[in-house]
Every structure is written in structure tokens, then in C-alpha cells.
Amino acid sequence: MATVTVSEISNQAAILRAELKEWERGFAAANGGKKAERGDIKKVPEIAAKYKEYSRLKSQESASSSKNDKSHSKPTDTQERSKKRKHSSPNGPEQSQSHCQTTSTPRKSAAGIFQTPSKLKTTHPADVDPYDSPSVLRRLFSPSTHMQTSSPLKTAIGPTPQRDGKALGLFDLLSESGGSTATPTAARMASLKGIAAQTPSKKRKMDTIREEDEEEEDSPRVERTPASSGKKYMLSALFATPTAWKYSSIVDDGTSRGVIGNNDVTKQSPQATRNIDHANANLETPSFLRRSTSGLTGPDPTDMSPLPVRKPQQFVGKGLSQLVQGLRDMEEERLEDEWDVLREIEIEQTGTGVDVPNSQAADPNSTGRTFKKKGQKRTTRLVKMRPVVQAKPTTTRSQPQSLSQSEPRFEHNLVSAGGSGDVDELGIDDNDLVAVAETQADGPPSGRVGIPAAFIDDDLDSLRSISEAEQDSDSDPDYDADSKPLGRSKSFSEKMKEAIGATGQGSDTKQAQERQKVKAKEKKEKENIDTNAKKPSTRKINPQAHANYRSLKIRNRGGGRNFGRFRRR
């Protein structure tokens, strides 16, 4: 009846477990792989009730299974149990014979009756929280989790192998002849078992198997084939970093004479030494490619002490900063010479240089350049060049004609009294006349009528002197600025025409025509002068310009005389 009850309980628990697992998978899929927690289970009352029922069934199943195990256990012979399981009880074989009746399933360890109770390693199902997931309960109640097995890491990872107090590397465990020292052979294990049966006089270490010489080898194992010279060379030179300890500890067999690893100096031949030097010379890095000359072993292979390390060769010449500074000094000297030449040329052009006599006599013995204190170089000063306004001349004066040119023309015109309408008797075109102000009264002079030709020469000389004086005279700018622009004075030809025309016939009509022409030209020139007068220029304002541009201090500019880089601080 009890067996049927246990099977029913296990079936119900399996059904509940399948339902709970299905719900857990659905919850994880809905929440992005998140597992159901205690709070999530409490939110669904049906699932919470199933969890409680599942924990109750599991506790009943465990209680009934323990009762069945106790009732169906049969007493066995103590001798047979001692043969099969020597240490079924934790206290040894003696106690296991006394309380063999209380032993449980082989999967579980038996508990001693007279043993001091200790804290249980597993929690009773009644004490387990009913909201724990089935995976937690399965881990708690599965017998495989309670079996006392050693951790795989403890067997895989052992202590660091050492020899003579020094840690061994991976390649140091390899023997020179190529045999493996880590995995023992069957023959060696048999020999070691025979040794272990004897009474040990001293505790032996089994961490590594030392290779023995042929004379000292008493074990019944078969001798190993000696490794070839190529294999020995590859192991010693390429696959392992040669250290001083390795050369001193490894003892090779008798076949390798004069090769690396043989510490016997007497057995080495000079030919072998030469071979070693040649091999090292081919393998070592060239001197020009080394970063630093490290300590090398001496020519004697038995000498374990390295040579003293050479210090790196120091740079004897100038450094880069000194070379750059020297180039800068040379450039400054060259610029100083150029500035001196420019200053001398400037002084010669302006003529402002004053020679000051030297108060100190020059030393005749001294050679080289005289010392000159270096001052401020390449000084830039702000110079505001304002435009200079010059008043334009208001009138254009005709060039004075010389007497040598005017007198022949005068004589020619006296002979030929007739002429065209545009060209007068003196041969002067109306286009050559410029509007000038009248300097003499209109009409012929009262005292000139009927003057003989003898007095005309004197009048010509006086007129020429007057006209030349007027041309040479300078105008007063203050007076000219206030007064109206005046026309030019009459030229020599005009004055001569007036003087001569007073005596000729029809002079009044000609003079009236000439006056009208002169007045018309004066009017035209006056209009031109008014239009060409300087008008006040309107100030153009850029609408995109900054309003406070003058108040900005841009690169220490525009701050006044004592505001630059070299101002007094």
C-alpha cells in the first residue's frame, strides 16, 4: 500500500512539474527571457497554489521513500560488507560493523548512531520556501548534487612544479633526449611499486622523474634510444630559452661531447668550441640591430656569470635644439647686417646723420667686430597717413611768349592789315583766348590817337615788363579763398591789338565784336568753374558694418600712443 502511495505521489508531482515548467517557458517568452521570480508567482494565484501543492507532494514522497528504504533493508554479513565497501561509515571499518543495520541506499552516506549531531548540509523539504522554482527543488533533492566528489579543478590544476626552490617552466620539464618525464611508463611504475613495498628510509618526492646516468641506473627498465643531434639542437636552441640553471642542471648522455649542455670542460674539443661559436654567431642579432648591448656569455660555455652590460653610447655631437639655436643666431646676425646697410643708405639719402667724433681711441691691437648692444628689432609703429588737400588753381595762365617770337609776327601783321573773320591781325585764333577779367578801361585810350610809330616801341617794352611781372607774381591763398575767381590778365597780343586798333579805320566796330566774344567766353568759363568746384563728399555708410567698431580693441590696436606691445608697464 505504501508503494502504491509513493508512485501516485510521484505521478502527481511529475504532472504538476510539467505544468509549472510550461508556465515558466511561456512567462520567459513573454518577458524577453526573464525567469519568473517570487513576486511574479504571487501575482498569479493558480500558479502559486500549484507551487504549494508541488512542494507538499515532494515532501511526502521523500518521507515515504525513506520509510520504505528502512523497512526493505536486510541485514548482511559483516565480512562480505567489509570486502565490498571498506569505509561505508565515516569513522572507519570498525564502526561500520557495529551499526551496519542503519546503513541506507549506496547513494547516501550512513549516519553513525553515537556520533555527535552536526548541522545538516541539506535543507528539509518542509523548510523550503514553497515559491522556489522546480529547478531549485530538483537541485536540492537530487542525490547527484549531494555526492561528495572532488572538484575537477583540484585534480587538473596542481601546484607549480619546482626544482631546487626554482619554479619550472613548460620547456624545462622536457629532457634533453626528448623523453617525457611527466607520464611514467609501466616499467617505471612497476619499479616504483617495488620500492614502495620496502620500508622507506626517507620520504621520496614523486613530482618529477629524474633521468639517471647509465652507471647509476639500477632499475630493470629498458634503456632509451639516445636522441639525435638535430633534435637536441632544436630543443636547446629554439624551443626553450637557455638559462644558467638549465645548463648547470641538465646532464646529457655520453654521446653529446662538446655540444650545448655538456659541462665537462676536459671532454670538450677545440673543434666543438668553434662549432658553438659559429652557431651562436649565426643565431644572435647583429650589433647594429640591437636596441642595447645585453650581457653575453663568455667564450667558455661553463662560465655561468654574464658579462657586464655595456652602457649605451652617448651622443657626443650637438643636440637638435643646439643646432636649431645656432641657425637662429646666424640668421639674426645676417639680418642685423642687412638692417645696418639699410640704415646707412637711409642716412645718406636724408642727410640727417651727424658724425660724432669718437672720444675713445681705437685699440690698434684689437681685431674683430666692435661690440654693439642689441636693441629692439623689427619695431612696427602705427603711422596714420592722412590725405593732404591741395587747392586747385582757379585760372589757367597761358605761357608767356618771348619777344623774339612776338616782334616778327607784329611786323608781319603791320604789313598785312587785312585778315579773316576768326583770325585777327596778330594771327591769334579766337579759340586761344581764355576768359579773363578786364584790366583796362573800355574804349581806346584818350591820349593814343595819332601817336607816331616812334613811341610804340617804348610802350611795347613797358607792356612786356608788366605782363612778365604779373606772371611771376604769386597769389595769396587766403585772399584767393575769400575773393571770387578772377580771369587772367590780358596777353601781350591783346594789348598790342588794342594799341594798334585805335589808329586803324573801323577799330570801334572790331573792338566791340572782340569784347562780345571775350565776354561770352568769360561767361562759359565761369559756368565751368562753378560746376567743377569741389563739392562736399557724402559719407557712405555700410549697413552691415559693426556699429561699435572703433571701441573694439583688436590685437592691441587703436589704443593710443602708449598702448602697443612695447608700452611702459
From Swiss-Prot:
Residues 469-480 have a biased composition (Acidic residues). This is DNA replication regulator sld2. It comes from Emericella nidulans (strain FGSC A4 / ATCC 38163 / CBS 112.46 / NRRL 194 / M139) (Aspergillus nidulans). Residues 67-81, 481-498, 511-533 have a biased composition (Basic and acidic residues). Residues 52-164, 193-230, 289-312, 350-427, 461-569 are annotated as: Disordered. The lineage of its organism: Eukaryota, Fungi, Dikarya, Ascomycota, Pezizomycotina. GO terms for biological process: DNA replication initiation; double-strand break repair via break-induced replication; mitotic DNA replication preinitiation complex assembly. It is found in: Cytoplasm; Nucleus. Residues 370-384, 552-569 have a biased composition (Basic residues). GO terms for molecular function: DNA replication origin binding; single-stranded DNA binding. The keyword Nucleus applies.
